[in-house]
Amino acid sequence: MNELRRTLQKRIKDKEALVGVVGLGYVGLPLVKAFLKKGFAVTGFDIDRRKVDMLNQGKSYIKHITAAELRPFLSTKRFAATTEFARLTDMDAVLICVPTPLDDHRNPDLSFVLTTTETIAGHLRKGQLVVLESTTYPGTTDEEMLPILERGGLKAGRDFFLAFSPERENPGDPVYTAENTPKVVGGLTKDCLALADTLYSQVVVKTVPVSSTRAAESTKLLENIFRSVNIALVNELKMIFDRMGIDVWEVIQAASSKPFGFMPFYPGPGLGGHCIPIDPFYLTWKAREVDYSTKFIELAGEINTAMPYYVINKTLEALAEKGKSFKGSKILVLGIAYKKDIDDQRESPSLKIISLLQKKGAKVEYNDPYVPESSGHREYPGMSLKSVPLTAKRLRQADAVIIATDHTSYDFGWIVKNAKLVVDTRNAVKAGSKNVIKA
C-alpha cells in the first residue's frame, strides 16, 4: 500500500484529518455541517467575504441551516471560514463545491472549477486528497483537473489523490440530508478511490464506489436527466390535457395507485435550481465529441424551458376575458424561490415569468416569505425587486395573482377569496373556484 495513502487513511479514521471545503453555498455548507457533526475539523473557503464574515460570526445565510447549528463548532474552534486560500496547504482533504453553470450559448462553463483547481495546484502538497463534487460532464476530473494538478510535478495516485463524488444535495429537504443520502465515489486510481471512500464513509450512511471518476460523473447526470425528461413529459401532458378539459393532476394521482412500473412526476411553471435545468446540457455538449445528438434530452429541455411562456399565455387569456391586457395590469407573483419552503432562487422559473411580464408592460410585484429581495441575477441583471407584504388589499388590487411557488405558509383559501384572478401553476388550489385557472 502507498505509504501516503496509509498515513492519510489513518488520519481520516482517527478523525484527525483536516477537511477543507471550497465553495460555501447550498452544497458546500451542508457538507461542512456533516463533517463537523462527525467530529472533523473543517475549514471553509470562499471568495465571498460576506459569507465568510457571517459564518465566523456564527450567522447563516441559508435558511435551512441555522446559526444555532454552526455556533457550537465555532466555539470549539473546529470550524472557521476564510478567503485565504494559502491555507489549503494545511488541509488533508480538499472538497470542491463550486458552481458549474452554462454560458450564454448553453455550453458548460467550467470557469469556477478550473480557477479553483489552479488555486489548489498552487498550494498542493504530497499526501493530499482532492475531490470534485460539482456536477459536470464525464471526463472533467481526468481531462481538465488532472493536468493542472500535476503541472507542479506531483503525480496523482502516487503523490496526491484525486476523486469525484457528485453532490446530491436537495435544499430544504426535511428527510434527506448530506448524512443520510448514499454517496457515489469514483477515484482516478484504486488508492484514490480507497481514500475518498474512507473519507465519506465516516460521514454518510453509505458509500457507493464505482469504477472510475467518469462513471461517477455520469451517475449524477443520469439522475438529473431522468428527472428532467419525466418532468418534461408531464408538462407536455398538462398542456395537452388542458385543451381536452382534463385535469392532469387528477390523472397523475390516479396513475400513482399502480404499485409497480410508475413513478409520479409533477408539472409546474418550469424547472429551477442549479441541477435539473442545467446538468442535461453538460452531457449534450460532451456527446458531440463522440458524434452523437441527444435529441430526446434536448427536446425535454425545450419543453421545460417553454413552461414560463405557457404560464404567461394562460394569464393573458384570462385577462383578455376581462377586457384587459398585460400593459398597465398589476400582477402579483407568489413565490420567487424555485421550490417551496426554501430561499434558493437559482434558475427559478419565477424570474423568467417576472421578466416576461415586465417586458409586456405589466406592473409586477412579488411576495416570498423566504426571499426578501431579488437582484444580482446573471440572466436578469436589471431585475431588482423586494418582496411586498401579502395583504388582502394587495390581493384585491392585483389584476392577476400567479402562484409560482406553493410555500407551505401561504393560505391559499384566503388568497383565492381575496383575489380577482388566480393563476395556479402548482395545483395549490382545489378545482372549482371560478376565479382560478390552472397553468
Q: Model-predicted segments: where are they?
A:
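Structural/interface elements that position substrates and couple domains in central-metabolism enzymes
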Residues: M1-A439
